[in-house]
Amino acid sequence: MIAYFDTSALVPLVVEEPGSRFCARLWDKAARVVSVRIAYAEGRAALAQAHRLGRLTSPALREAVSQLDAVYGQLDRIEVDDDLVRRAGLLAEEQALRGYDAVHLAAAERIQDRDAVLISGDAQLCRAARQMGFAVSQPQ
């Protein structure tokens, strides 16, 4: 299985959340794990916000960033280029997606493999992906 992880599925790999075990099982099961290059910046932003909100202590933030670095290093990364952002813009409009979610969906389209599964905790992104024919796994 090729697993495309959006940021909402990557963060539970490095911070204990309700979907952490689910995401870890899919990560371990995948023959190949893929995301878009900007997932790192988006993940760091999510970890920093968790720290600002008091959900992560400073040492826990440093550990989570270290783990995110390791996870990111194992990903096959899809590059953000002009074609991708233009496709994402169209998907944002057609599928009522936020910008980064549209970028994730446009990136997942580039995999072009029947065994690919999009993994996301975002209900709107999952809905749009299903409408477009993707196999989807959503952490509960």
Q: PLM features: residue spans?
A:
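Acidic catalytic patch
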Residues: A39, S66-Q95, A102-A106
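Short, well-structured N-terminal submotif of metal-dependent ribonuclease cores
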Residues: M1-A39, A50-E63
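Short active-site oxyanion
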Residues: M1, A30-V33, Q74-D76, Q112-V117
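Anionic, Ser/Thr-rich low-complexity intrinsically disordered regions
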Residues: R25, A64-V71, R77, L125-P139
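Acidic, PIN/NYN-like endoribonuclease modules and their adjacent C-terminal/linker elements
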Residues: I2, L105-A106, R110-Q140
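Entry/capping segment at the start of metal-dependent catalytic domains
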Residues: G43
